[in-house]
UniProtKB/Swiss-Prot annotation:
Belongs to the EF-Ts family. Transmembrane segments: none annotated. HAMAP family: EF_Ts. This is Elongation factor Ts. One of its GO terms (molecular function) is translation elongation factor activity. Signal peptide: none annotated. SUPFAM superfamilies: Elongation factor Ts (EF-Ts), dimerisation domain, UBA-like. InterPro entries: EF-Ts_dimer_sf, Transl_elong_EFTs/EF1B, Transl_elong_EFTs/EF1B_dimer, Transl_elong_Ts_CS, UBA-like_sf.
């Protein structure tokens, strides 16, 4: 063990990101051959990654990369928020989303096969990161959108939104994306709300209106009014703009000669059982504060 120099240990540590004692142990077992030691550590890292794959990873970050009329959103999960805030984890997420964009990846499989700036695939980088930090890391979701005008907004790494517009500019699209992060609309316009959702709301409103004891024609008008209000509340265009509640989002974009085509929103851990945190309320408070 005394034949292994500190310089060699340092070099292996820089290459693998592993701990000093782990690097020294690998070099001893490889009789000082740094290439062999690095390869054995990669194999060991693969084994560690396989063992950790079943552990729940519900924390993490949302990363967005938009360029050349195309945007990619990635959700990358870790087991703890502590790791999600680690610079090494963040760097991996940034590398992954850029690689996905460059490869025009549309599926998780295509994202994992994409080459990063170091020449390794996202999957290889993921497994190396697992070996280094000791947590299950998963590339869970990828969403893409193409449009003439794109605006991205990320809140604390936990909510990522891309707004796609026809016309307008990036600043307007980013404002729309920020609004989506804060208010979380269901759809762009009221006519996109699924019929079964509208029917369910109408059923509830009808039952409530009948309890008022008012005449049938009045009840019908009440129901129509409640449905219209509901559609405005859940549709982006009908909502009060979060930065200026005196105007609707529809007027905001129309006045600038633009049209909202679509939006994509990802929340970290969405659909995974985890501690609930009201990030939308946090966005709202920061915008108003």
């Amino acid at each position: 063990m005394s034949n292994i120099s500190a310089k060699l240990v340092k070099e292996l540590r820089e290459r693998t990101g592993a701990g000093m004692m782990e690097c020294k142990k690998a070099l001893v077992e490889a009789a000082g051959d740094i290439e062999k030691a690095a390869e054995e550590m990669r194999i060991s890292g693969q084994a560690k990654a396989d063992k950790k794959a079943s552990r729940i990873a519900a924390e993490g970050v949302i990363e967005v990369y938009a360029a050349d009329g195309r945007a990619v959103l990635l959700e990358i999960n870790s087991e703890t928020d502590f790791v999600a805030r680690d610079d090494t984890f963040k760097k991996f997420a940034q590398e992954a989303v850029k690689a996905a964009h460059a490869a025009k990846a549309e599926t998780i499989e295509e994202v994992l096969a994409a080459k990063t700036s170091t020449g390794e695939t996202v999957e290889e980088a993921r497994k190396s990161l697992i070996a280094k930090i000791g947590e299950n890391i998963q590339v869970r979701r990828v969403k893409t959108v193409a449009a003439s005008t794109l605006g991205a907004y990320i809140h604390g790494g936990k909510i990522g939104v891309v707004a796609a517009l026809e016309g307008g500019d990036e600043e307007l699209a980013k404002d729309v994306a920020m609004h989506v992060a804060a208010v979380n609309p269901m759809v762009v316009s009221g006519d996109e709300v699924p019929a079964d959702v509208v029917a369910k709301e109408k059923e509830i409103f009808t039952a409530q209106a009948k309890e008022s004891g008012k005449p049938a024609e009045i009840i019908e008008k009440m129901i129509v009014g409640r449905i219209r209000k509901f559609l405005d509340e859940v549709a982006l265009l009908g909502q009060d703009f979060v930065k200026d509640p005196s105007i609707k989002v529809e007027k905001l974009v129309k006045d600038k000669g633009a049209k909202v085509v679509s939006f994509i929103r990802l929340d970290v851990g969405e659909g995974i059982e985890k501690k609930e945190e009201d990030f939308a309320a946090e966005v709202m408070s920061q915008i108003k504060g």
